[in-house]
């Protein structure tokens, strides 16, 4: 059905499963491997003989040549994109007698969750793993439901230098990587999408371990003018609808021709689409910035000119570029913020695996800095702060 008004709030409510997920996390913390084996049998209907996936090399060797080629090509593209935006190891300067700067250091141990669902998703492992490799992460661990670990997952894991693959899915996988078990290594950060149980688990463990964010259902906003190809618009919307019935799909257009054609063609579909007539492209940009979508597609004649006006979006495709290419081979990531989070953060990149360490050095700072520091420290009641500064430079 076609809707002509946007909802006030997008559905992404995992609060209804929080209590169940809390119990899972608590059980894993208490029982470790024993809990994982029991929970896998309960939820994934698999009786594990080993939590650590064996014979990765053997499984990787079974990959088909065409799939291997596709993975190699996409791996290289993602690597080159992230390497091109990787910052220098040290950035700094000086002022008023003080040398200062930042050092970029990689996170040491990362856990990547590769979701199950109807299919295995090797593209997610590429998107999460390659930026970690570029950043210099020394230990990468992967967890995925046991029935979804296939030759593609194994092959990519070898290319990434993954230390171990765990045959664990769902909230129990997140708990295991967050707190560690007899077999599963405790990591510093967990990255990767998943269902509401996985997202609830990431939310609950986020006070103890880093996470990439809370990813909700797929979102796409298309802004189209009269130059856009309506058939391509329909394909782009249907492509993102493949992610499930919870997807949030919006067309904003100032063209009656586009609006009418797309509405007619999509009306027979079971998914819900929002088709909105706007007065101008500027108005459409304003609406898109308020939505802050995961994917934004500017299918307009002057897309490059309008790109700087985009303030909030996970990823933007310009002109005739299909949004789906970012899901696979463009180089930027498909693990993107949803549900308005694009207002404050972006998609996964090399920066998600780097941390800043600030430094300062001085033997002779200008007197005004010394005096200012002492005055403010004493004002705040920190006398020894003031003395530790003053004794060195007076």
Curated annotation (Swiss-Prot):
CC annotations in GO: cytoplasm
Enzyme class: oxidoreductase
Cofactor: Zn(2+)
Residues that coordinate or bind NAD(+): 113, 172, 195
Residues that hold substrate according to the record: 218, 240, 243, 295, 327, 380, 385
Catalytic residues (UniProt): 294-295
GO molecular function ontology, one term from the record: zinc ion binding
Cofactor: record remark: Binds 1 zinc ion per subunit.
Keyword tags: Amino-acid biosynthesis, Histidine biosynthesis, Metal-binding, NAD, Oxidoreductase, Zinc
Pfam family for this entry, one: Histidinol_dh
Binding residue positions for Zn(2+): 240, 243, 327, 385
EC code(s) of this entry: 1.1.1.23
Pathway: Amino-acid biosynthesis; L-histidine biosynthesis; L-histidine from 5-phospho-alpha-D-ribose 1-diphosphate: step 9/9
Catalyses which reaction(s): L-histidinol + 2 NAD(+) + H2O = L-histidine + 2 NADH + 3 H(+)
Cited InterPro entries: Ald_DH/histidinol_DH, Histidinol_DH_CS, Histidinol_DH_monofunct, Hstdl_DH
GO BP, one annotated term: L-histidine biosynthetic process
Function: Catalyzes the sequential NAD-dependent oxidations of L-histidinol to L-histidinaldehyde and then to L-histidine.
Family: Belongs to the histidinol dehydrogenase family.
UniProt protein name: Histidinol dehydrogenase
Lineage: Archaea, Thermoproteota, Thermoprotei, Sulfolobales, Sulfolobaceae
Name of the gene encoding the protein in the UniProt record: hisD
């Amino acid at each position: 059905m076609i809707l002509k008004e946007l909802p006030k709030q997008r559905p992404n409510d995992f609060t209804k499963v929080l209590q169940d997920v809390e119990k899972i996390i608590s059980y894993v913390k208490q029982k470790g491997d024993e809990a994982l084996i029991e929970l896998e049998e309960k939820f994934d209907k698999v009786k594990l003989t080993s939590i650590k996936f064996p014979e990765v090399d053997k499984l990787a060797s079974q990959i088909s040549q065409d799939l291997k080629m596709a993975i190699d090509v996409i791996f290289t593209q993602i690597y080159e994109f992230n390497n091109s935006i990787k910052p220098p190891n040290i950035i700094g300067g000086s002022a008023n007698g003080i040398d200062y700067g930042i050092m970029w250091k990689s996170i040491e141990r990362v856990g990547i969750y590769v979701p199950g669902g109807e299919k295995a998703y090797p593209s997610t492992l590429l998107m999460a793993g390659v930026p970690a490799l570029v950043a210099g992460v020394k230990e990468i661990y992967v967890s995925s439901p046991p029935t979804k670990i296939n030759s593609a997952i194994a092959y990519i894991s070898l290319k990434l230098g993954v230390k171990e693959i765990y045959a664990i899915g769902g909230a129990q996988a997140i708990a295991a990587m967050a707190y560690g078990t007899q077999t599963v290594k405790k990591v510093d950060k967990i990255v990767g999408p998943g269902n509401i149980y996985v997202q609830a688990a990431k939310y609950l463990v986020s006070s103890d371990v880093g996470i990439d964010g809370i990813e909700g259902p797929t979102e796409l906003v298309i802004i189209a003018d009269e130059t856009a190809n309506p058939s391509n618009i329909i394909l782009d919307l249907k492509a993102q609808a493949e992610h499930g019935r919870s997807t949030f799909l919006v067309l904003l257009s100032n063209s009656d021709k586009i609006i009418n054609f797309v509405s007619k063609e999509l009306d027979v579909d079971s998914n819900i689409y929002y088709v909105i007539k706007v007065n101008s492209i500027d108005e459409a940009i304003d609406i898109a910035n308020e939505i802050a979508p995961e994917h934004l597609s500017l299918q307009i004649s002057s897309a490059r000119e309008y790109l700087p006006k985009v303030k909030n979006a996970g990823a933007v495709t310009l002109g005739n570029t299909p949004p789906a290419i970012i899901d696979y081979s463009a180089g930027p990531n498909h693990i993107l913020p949803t549900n308005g989070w694009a207002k404050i953060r972006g998609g996964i990149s090399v920066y998600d695996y780097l941390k800043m360490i600030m430094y300062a050095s001085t033997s002779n700072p200008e007197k005004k800095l010394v005096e200012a520091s002492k005055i403010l420290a004493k004002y705040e009641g920190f006398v020894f702060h003031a003395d530790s500064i003053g004794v060195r430079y007076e």
